A protein has these predicted regions:
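Extended beta-strand/beta-hairpin segments
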Residues: 1-53, 65-145
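Heme-based O2/NO sensor domains and their adjacent alpha-helical segments
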Residues: 62
Length: 145
């Protein structure tokens, strides 16, 4: 169980003469981070792409955890996200759309809405950190099996 007081630390190291970094947290696998041409070489994820992945996986983790605690059978889960950037600097996201695609034979829309609300309100720290500055719209679709 993750301790609430656990301190996380990361390291990013420059690997070329542009903006290509290798980053890691603790003993996890490194991730390649770069910037778009001409400043970078497109050799890895951009920082905003990593933010989208972090948000999607954070929401997905909390949603799946609560659905499983409700004894729901989940045969598949795919989360697609799209970020819409601001025109002015800093050109971070002004809006992010997250679509959760779930495969299940016993899941209801109400079940999913309930756990999404829990994720938004309390259990997804990435969402909690960005919600004040970025509109986040979460939708879902259930594929019946």
């Amino acid at each position: 169980m993750l301790e609430k007081t656990k301190e996380l630390s990361s390291t990013v190291k420059l690997v070329n003469n542009k903006l290509h970094f290798m980053g890691s947290v603790d003993n996890n696998e490194p991730v390649s981070i770069d910037y778009i041409s001409p400043l970078g070489d497109d050799l890895g994820y951009t920082s905003l792409e990593l933010l989208l992945l972090s948000l999607s996986s954070c929401i997905g983790s909390s949603v799946l955890t609560f659905l499983r605690r409700m004894n729901k059978t989940i045969s598949s889960c795919e989360i697609k996200s799209r970020g819409f950037r601001k025109e002015e600097h800093p050109t971070g996201f002004r809006k992010i759309e997250v679509n959760i695609l779930l495969g299940s034979g016993d899941l209801t829309d109400e079940d999913v809405r309930k756990v999404i609300a829990l994720s938004e309100d309390k259990y997804c720290p990435v969402y909690s950190m960005i919600k004040a500055s970025t509109e986040v719209i979460i939708s879902h679709y259930i594929q019946r099996n």
